[in-house]
Amino acid sequence: MNTFLIDYQRIRTPKKGFSKLFCDYSSESEARTKLLADCFHLDYRKDGDYYRHLGFLASRNFRREALVELLTEQNERFDGSERQQREIEKLRSPRCMAIVTGQQTGLFTGPLYTIYKALTAVVLARKQKELFPEYDFVPVFWIESEDHDFDEASSTVLFSGGGLEQITAEAAHRLPDQMAGATQLGASIGATVQEFLDLLPDTEFKPEIAEILESCYEPGVTFEIAFARTMNRLFREHPLILLSAQDTRFKQLAVEVLCREVETAPASSYDVVAQSSILESMGYPAQTKPRAVNLFYLNQLGQRLKIEQPSPDNFLIVPDRQRYTRHQLLEICQDHPEKFSPNVILRPIVQDAVLPTFAYIGGPGEISYLAQFRKAYEHFGLSMPFVIPRGSFTLVEPKIARTMDKVLKATGRPSFSRRQVYEAVFEDVQELRKSMVSGGDSQKLDALFEQVESEVTRSLSTLEPALVKMDPTLQAALSASSGQITKIIGTIKEKTYRAGRRKHDELLQQLDKAELNLFPDGKPQERSINIFHYLNKYGPSLIGELAKVLQGYSTEAHLIVEL
């Protein structure tokens, strides 16, 4: 596998993917230094912070036995392996820490970045064990099954026929705002699996993929269990602990945080607003807005309902219209914490209250909104863990790599390397196209046209004083003529590039296909395409190969991997 690194700051072609905050966070800049100092508790580049955080975790009293019992039962329910169980058992020791990541349930695991998050947690746990052999580090994947965005959870995307194909699964029965993970797969899931498999070409690996999906996705099984079982099958050789946070026993472990939110609301929201102001003063937009109560209420139908606070001592469940005093809602939370679900703000705090979280593996969006939560963590007496960027990949298939070779020749720049061609594609693919159609001389042509236009404009301007002196009305005629000449030059310029485009039309079409592969729907590949597209072609061992790549590289740059 050939591997190339690209700085996040240079990636501009995809419409979405890497925010300014994330680019600064992963850079070597003064902006990063200030961002870490003002918005986070720890810097993963500072050795002293590692020992400080290990000491903080060692001082806390985690309910490890109850946590192990919960994870053991879930491991059995998710068809986990003995190797995973051995990882779970390590958590009994106060010298075992967790490397945590997570994602909501996705159909057939969802976008590629779900796999990349899990892989990064696995690899980082190994690396930390090498650095601190007296401790154990286990990778934990938080399944965000309480999220009620069913449209996102029930669909996935594959390449198909030179385009993209979205596959969507139907629910057996679903109410508005119902937790996506708890929703059962409908009777048509078998047909959905077959539709997905039909989009995959026949390979030596396809029968194994079919067996995995057909056994994990069955009518009546919840989206969460199907997702978890599929993840366990893919990570058999790389033990990953899966955690379902919708479990009643997990909520009992988190009861102190849940109750404190009810007891002190809207205090944590004020903290988020204050931290967001700091962030905005640094030039970064706030990613999320807090509610008065950063909890949802789960009714008997599994619907995730908002909790509003119309007055300091009164709470309202919307849209059920149930009203509670603070004391009443607090009693419900103490007796039945399973009726409450943290929102995007409280979720990481609940996570780090229950788990001995050494580090959290986050994507660009997550790191951006975690920057708003420092003061909220302090409100609950917690320190933020290390926040480490997940591995970010673009997988380049052989056909696309060959196109890159042709593009390299077409640019007319013999000094260009393959890495520089990828940089050009990721930085500005339109500029690269322009370079190709002019045989590598686009900059010279641009300069020549600009020179001609400038000289004509300057020549005409020398006429202006004499013409105005003769007849002031001639100034308008001169101005109009200047505009027409500029327009004519622009037309000639466009025709020049069109002539070049015809000359290189075939290669440009290949570049269009490469762009679709690298940036499907204008987004980074990892944000849309499903992992099984690649596992079907290159085998399940691809996950191990990507783990090896991560083992040797930092996650502070984007990785381009030629398969």
From Swiss-Prot:
Signal peptide (residue range): none
Recorded coiled-coil stretches: 493-518
Protein name: Putative cysteine ligase BshC
Organism of this sequence: Chlorobaculum tepidum (strain ATCC 49652 / DSM 12025 / NBRC 103806 / TLS) (Chlorobium tepidum)
Keyword terms of this UniProt record: Coiled coil, Ligase
Disulfide bonds: none
Pfam families reported in the protein's UniProt record: CC_BshC (PF24850), Rossmann-like_BshC (PF10079)
Lineage, top ranks: Bacteria, Pseudomonadati, Chlorobiota, Chlorobiia, Chlorobiales
Gene: bshC
GO MF, one example: ligase activity
Domain of life (superkingdom): Bacteria
Protein family (similarity comment): Belongs to the BshC family.
InterPro entries: Bacillithiol_biosynth_BshC, CC_BshC, Rossmann-like_BshC
Catalytic activity, EC: 6.-.-.-
